[in-house]
Structures are given as C-alpha cells and as structure tokens.
C-alpha cells in the first residue's frame, strides 16, 4: 500500500478516535453493557481488515501478515486518537480542572483503585484531604468533600443529587438500595416501610432474641474457659444468623456450628471487588468472568434457591420479607419482580449483617479501652429490670442518654459505612461553601473523615459520650453525624439496627467485664479494618469475665 495512502488512513483513524471521544463518550452513561463495546471494537477490527483488503490497489499483493500488521496499526492509531483526546480533555478542559488533587486522578478512575491496594478508601481519602484540603478531585469526574455543609447538600432531604452509576453494579438485580430513579425508589421504600413499623419491630425482636440467647450462651462457655475470644467473629455469626432469619425465615446456623456458613464465605469473597471502587463499566465486565466472580454467583444461586423456598412458606411470626411479598397477593413474581426480591433479600443480609457486626465490634473496642465509661453505663442501666433471660425491654434502653451517647461516639469514630457513598450532582451543579461542583459529577463525603473534623466537632480525637446530651456545644454541626446516611436514601433499617445494638450492648456490659488480652490494646486490629462499602473488622480479641 502506498505510503501516502497509509498516512491518510492513519490520520483518518486517529481523527475517528478523537471524534468518538468528543461526541460520544463525553456524554451520557456507558457502563451497563461493557461487553457491547468489546464486541463493537472486535467487529470494527474485522471491518477495517476487510476494508483494507478490498481497497488495496490491484497491482499490490497484500499478504495475511501485512494485512494483520496494517489493521493493528490503524486500530492502535484510532485508540491513540481516542485516549489522547481523553487525556487532554480531562487534564486541561474538564469542568473539574480547577479542583485540587493528584494529577493521575484527573486522568483515570483506576488511579484510586490502584491506590486502594495500600488500604481501605476511608483511610486513603483521609490522607488525601490532609494533603489537598477539604475538597479533593479523586477521579476524572469524582470529588470528595469534607466540609460540614456537604452532608446536607449531597445527602439531605432537600438534596438535588441522585444516585450515580455505582448503584447499577448488580443490574438487572435491583434492591431498595440500588434504585436510582427517585420516584421508583420512593414507591419501593413505601413497601419496605410497612416492615419497619413499631408492631413489625416487636415481631422481629422475638426472632432476634432466639439468636441473642445463643450468642450469650457461646460467650459464657468461652468466658468460663477463660479463653481469648475473637468477639468480631461471634458478632458476625450472630448478625448473619439473625438477618438470614429475617430475610428468609431461615438461619445460617453459624452460632450452632461456630463457623461461617459456606454461602457466607462465598458472599465475603464475592464482595472483595467492592473494596477497589472500580469504575462501574469495569466492575460489570469483571462480574461476567466466571474465574473472577464464581464465588459471588454461587452465593446468588444459594440465595435464589432460599428465596424461592421462602415464597412457598407461611411463617408464624412475620419477617421483613413478608412485607416485601405482600404486594404479590399470593401470585408468582414476574422476572423483574424476582430480580427485585432477590436484590432486596441480598440487601437485608449484607447491609444488616456487616454493619451490625462492625458496629458491635467497634463498641466493644471502646468499652474495653474505657472502664470508667463502662461504670457509667452500668449505673445507668442497673435501675432497669431485666427478664429471666437477662434481656431488657428496648423501649427503656432507648431513653438512656449515656448509652445512646456512647453508641453515637462509636459511630462517629468508627462509622459502619466510613468511605464512599456516591451521589451524582444535578445538571445545574451544586455549591458547597465557595466551591462550585458542575453537573453530572460524582461527589461524596466520607463519614470517617467527617467524624474527625474540627469544623464539625470540638476535640474530635477525644471519645466523649457526653457531647451528645450534656455538653452539646462540643458538636458544632450535628447534621454532619450520619452513620445511617440522611435524606430520602437513608437506611430504612435504622430502627431495627439500633434496637439490636442497644439490647446487645446492655446485656453484654451487665453480664461481663470486658478487657483486652495481656499486651493488647485493640488498636492494631482497628487499623487492620477492611472495607467493601461497609467496614469489616475481622479480628478483635478480648477476654470476657462473668460478673455474677
């Protein structure tokens, strides 16, 4: 092929790459079906090869090797044009170009994913904020903000922000958590709300007490043996057994077996990908590769079978799923409804189990460090009469200021969702103080950093439960405190979680003295906490001693 012709083809290929970026990929969302783009470019490659062969001058012989070489050269030139345009746009012309942050973060979202090999997002983001200030560009279109005003603007009741592409990672499986359309979300939330009224919560409490009894039996056995207990593991067993029952009317039996159910192991392995905050298109690409997502799909298969069994069962004491099944009026669900029920069941298990276990573990960590606070809690709880099983009525615990203050302090410093809860800015953009964030950008405000912000709290490094009821001036911006998020997308399970946490903590401190093993202070285990959207504290060794 003549060199002049080849140069013309190369210039055209590069120009096409530039145009595709500027006129297609710059606009809208393209994450739902990533394999379509893979197939498109494979077809494009074959089309280019066929075109080169058809257009070759008659006097030239084009060997298969030359055809492959010329095709690859044109495709590489096309990609160079596309990515050069992308690079120049993101670094020089992007609407976020004035926001400070690492240079590589401007170029690719994979920069943050790569950085997360060093640790969980909440710690990495905290380091970035210490270096760059309260507003940091952490990706081409992603901004982390820790100004106190940001919480209300991004997540609050009157926020104009919506959910971004992250919430499509499980598509077509849907859940209350993943609805991006506000109207559809509100409609589904009304269905869920029927399962979280006072009457429903009292029913769930009956079911939860069964597993709490088992938990304390196991803890007492180990306390009598004077052995070190990984309290995090036992809270995990308890939480998954409880939420499995509430989701499917069927426990995972982890407290009985004293080990993880195989399906829970599959779930934990399958959730690892969430730690790295991959772009949604890449996450969905990986999720279709059996070698990388086999564990996740095994859990989905188990959960699907269990859900279908639950559809055919009648339960005496209603579970959460009973409220979700009510709109069906006894008929079989459609495919879309089945995907929705499957997603909601997964949400009950993952959101309810991980966050509760982490919250209880972080509270025990603080209890073991602060015996003076334990004395205050016992003095507050002792006037309340427990039943024969050692259980307390939640209504009485809910009114105790120091117990609530202690739990709030643990949430402030160890939020169960400590890092990225992404939102998409409205087309007109948002203002946070004197910073303008343009429309259709991803923003978030990590709770782990907000809980340590001197702009929101006086002496934020000091653990002081009284800041929540006695010295309220120590909380400068109460709206910043959002362990369950706030606004229309806030956690609907907060009343259930708080009931579970209060009753478990009260019984624990009245039944046991809690301390760390000799030579331990728990700090290294908190520093080793992982994250896959929710925080995970895998180890927290303590020694429990019966009080009486």
Curated annotation (Swiss-Prot):
Q: Name one GO biological process term.
A: alkaloid metabolic process
* Species assigned in the record: Neosartorya fischeri (strain ATCC 1020 / DSM 3700 / CBS 544.65 / FGSC A1164 / JCM 1740 / NRRL 181 / WB 181) (Aspergillus fischerianus)
What protein name is recorded for this chain? Tryprostatin B 6-hydroxylase
Keyword Metal-binding carried by entry: yes
What range does the record give for the signal peptide? none
Which UniProt key words apply to this protein?
Alkaloid metabolism, Heme, Iron, Membrane, Metal-binding, Monooxygenase, Oxidoreductase, Transmembrane, Transmembrane helix, Virulence
The coenzyme or cofactor needed here is: heme
Please indicate which superkingdom the organism of origin belongs to: Eukaryota
**Alphabetized GO MF terms:** heme binding; iron ion binding; monooxygenase activity; oxidoreductase activity, acting on paired donors, with incorporation or reduction of molecular oxygen
Its primary localisation, in coarse terms, equals: membrane
The record, for Pfam families, names: p450
- What PANTHER family would the database entry show? CYTOCHROME P450, L-ORNITHINE-N5-MONOOXYGENASE (EUROFUNG)
Its EC number(s): 1.14.14.118
* Key word Glycoprotein present: no
Chain's role: Cytochrome P450 monooxygenase; part of the gene cluster that mediates the biosynthesis of fumitremorgins, indole alkaloids that carry not only intriguing chemical structures, but also interesting biological and pharmacological activities. The biosynthesis of fumitremorgin-type alkaloids begins by condensation of the two amino acids L-tryptophan and L-proline to brevianamide F, catalyzed by the non-ribosomal peptide synthetase ftmPS/ftmA.
Give the reaction(s) catalysed.
tryprostatin B + reduced [NADPH--hemoprotein reductase] + O2 = 6-hydroxytryprostatin B + oxidized [NADPH--hemoprotein reductase] + H2O + H(+)
- Can you tell me where the transmembrane regions are? 5-25, 35-54, 73-93
Q: Which family does it belong to?
A: Belongs to the cytochrome P450 family.
From the record, give the cysteines joined by S-S bonds: none
- Check the record and name the InterPro entries matching this protein: Cyt_P450, Cyt_P450_E_grp-I, Cyt_P450_sf, Cytochrome_P450_monoxygenase
Q: Which residues bind heme?
A: 491
Pathway terms, separated by semicolons? Mycotoxin biosynthesis
The subcellular location is:
Membrane
| Membrane topology, from the record | Multi-pass membrane protein
GO cellular component terms, A-Z: membrane
